[in-house]
């Protein structure tokens, strides 16, 4: 089992890389800049240049050939302009989905926004383009030929993780979760053969990750 983490230099992705390395999982960190590749390799981490905005589907397909699983943890966030959001969070995601299909990826894990339903389009200000992009990227993944899991984390914090969460298809309220715990969830999902064609929201809670996700196995 070989895993590609796209967005390995991000807030969640970098924590996931640390956790996968600690557990001696076979993975490669996908990052956008050559200097990031060099820095990771200097720390004994396999790395690959993955630029979801500028790489073609053919480029990505060729890069994905040696992997079994892909995690998409790339995000422009709400602070960039709408154009960058659609280039990265929508078109970039769709290109990786198409490339994963062509490369025969066995499991594609998407890190989405907390709520990407159409009802969430009323998000104010800069978050609206981001929510729209995530909505259509998630929907494209659901209708692809891939075995997928979509993870919808709540508000992201830099606090130390607790390893305790709660999960549901849709919660009635909004709360937060440390990035470290989101990474733990991703590690648990991607190193398992379960969670086929499932999606769920995750927040800080009182249950272990294993117990919280039992309903989605």
Regions found by a protein language model. Give the residues of each.
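N-terminal Rossmann NAD(P)H-binding glycine-rich loop of SDR-like oxidoreductase domains
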Residues: 3-25
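Non-catalytic, hydrophobic alpha-helical segments
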Residues: 12, 70, 151, 182-186, ...
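Conserved Rossmann-fold NAD(P)-dependent oxidoreductase catalytic core, especially the SDR/UDP-sugar
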Residues: 26-28, 34, 80, 84-86, ...
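NAD(P)H-binding glycine-rich loop region in Rossmannoid oxidoreductase-like domains
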Residues: 31-95, 99-102, 190-194
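Substrate-positioning beta->alpha
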Residues: 93, 172-187, 198
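Glycine/proline-rich active-site loop of Rossmann-fold NAD(P)-dependent oxidoreductases
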Residues: 120, 160-165, 189-198
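Flexible, glycine-rich beta-alpha linker
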Residues: 149-170
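Short-chain dehydrogenase/reductase
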Residues: 199-207
């Amino acid at each position: 089992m070989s895993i590609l983490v796209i967005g390995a230099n991000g807030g969640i992705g970098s924590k996931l890389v640390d956790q996968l390395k600690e557990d001696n999982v076979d993975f490669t960190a996908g990052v956008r800049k050559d200097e990031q590749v060099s820095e990771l390799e200097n720390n004994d981490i396999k790395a690959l240049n993955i630029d979801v905005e500028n790489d073609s589907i053919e480029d990505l397909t060729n890069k994905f050939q040696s992997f079994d699983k892909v995690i998409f943890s790339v995000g422009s966030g709400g602070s960039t302009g709408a154009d960058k959001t659609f280039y990265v969070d929508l078109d970039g995601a769709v290109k990786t989905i198409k490339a994963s299909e062509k490369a025969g990826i066995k499991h594609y894990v998407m890190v989405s926004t907390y709520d990407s339903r159409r009802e969430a389009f009323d998000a104010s200000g800069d978050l609206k383009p981001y929510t729209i992009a995530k909505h259509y990227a998630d929907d494209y993944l659901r209708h692809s030929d891939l075995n997928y899991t979509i993870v919808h984390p709540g508000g992201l914090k830099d606090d130390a993780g607790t390893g305790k969460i709660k999960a549901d298809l849709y919660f009635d309220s909004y709360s937060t979760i440390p990035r470290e715990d989101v990474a733990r969830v991703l590690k648990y999902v991607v190193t398992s053969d379960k969670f086929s064609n499932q999606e769920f929201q995750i927040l800080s809670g009182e249950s272990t990750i294993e117990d919280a996700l039992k309903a989605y196995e």
